[in-house]
Amino acid sequence: MELIRGLHNLKNHSSCVVTIGNFDGVHKGHQKILNKLVSLAKKKGVPSLVISFSVTPEAFFGRTKAKLSSFRDKHLFLESLGIDKHLLIRFNREFSEVSAESFIGDVLVKRLGIKHCLVGDDFQFGKGRRGDFAMLKKASHRMNFIVEEVEELNLENNRISSSAIRGLLLKGDFRQAEEYLGRPFTISGRISHGDKRGRTIGFPTANIGIRRKISPVLGVYSVVIKVRDEEHVGVCNIGKRPTIGGSKVLLEVFIFNFNEEIYGEYVSIIFKQKCRDEIKFNSFDELKDQIKQDVETSKKYFKGENYLT
């Protein structure tokens, strides 16, 4: 899949089929649109193109939400679905002033040569969010392209959305979140050197820096760790580590029965069960005792799920 970073790197296209959105998490609702896009592109013999944004419009205007997926993971998910091109638009002050009419005429029609556009039923775009399906439909008659609204996807009468998934993760309902996502909730990243405090209390951890300012999960969890195409189990803490006065969100994972050198490795942390919220302890001895309990809680969980520990 070709990644086009910014409109300044976009070469004019003669034709393509397009969808537009944030696609945070690339959940089943998104997949419904994306699968239809790929099918349409093959039928018409033109490229499928997804437009997404460097930051969400909500985040740009100060309404930051916890991201379900990193840009890297989102890009890989799109690629796995068979998307041909991914246009990443830098959402900045200048772009926020682009009217919906200009976006249709200058970007979709002139630059992309749009033939068919798929949008979700709640889609809005352009300055002041003035653009919607009705505006696209009206423009399509004048500018010779087809626009189609894809209905929401529901599971047991509940709308599948990124917001709904955030709510499930907050409650620790990973089974339902997996149903909505179409795969387990996962955070991926590169193992970095930490302060090695865990070693001093008998629980050496692998550390992953979390770039997102707000995490959709906070606390202690039973997790599966994928490293070098192998799966291991363990317990992780994601939070600011209040016992030592931490200020940045960090993911630390203690992998059971594992002592290999993995600094610099790219790993995936698959969340299975919430053990507890993050707590500020009065001493490292209290913290050590609680970690022992967390380890036992996780081992019992994995034994019940028939994972080897």
Predicted feature locations:
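Phosphate/ribose-recognition catalytic cores of enzymes acting on nucleotide-derived substrates
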Residues: 143, 194-309
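N-terminal catalytic cores of NTP/NDP-binding nucleotidyl/phosphoryl-transfer enzymes
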Residues: 9-70
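A glycine-rich helix N-cap at a beta->alpha junction
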Residues: 73-87
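Classical nucleotidyltransferase
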Residues: 97-204, 228, 282-286
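Glycine-rich, highly charged phosphate/nucleotide-binding loops
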Residues: 65-74, 98-104
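Short acidic-hydrophobic, aromatic-tinged amphipathic segments that line or gate anion-handling sites
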Residues: 2-8, 87
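Residue-level signal for inorganic ion chemistry
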Residues: 27, 78, 117, 177, ...
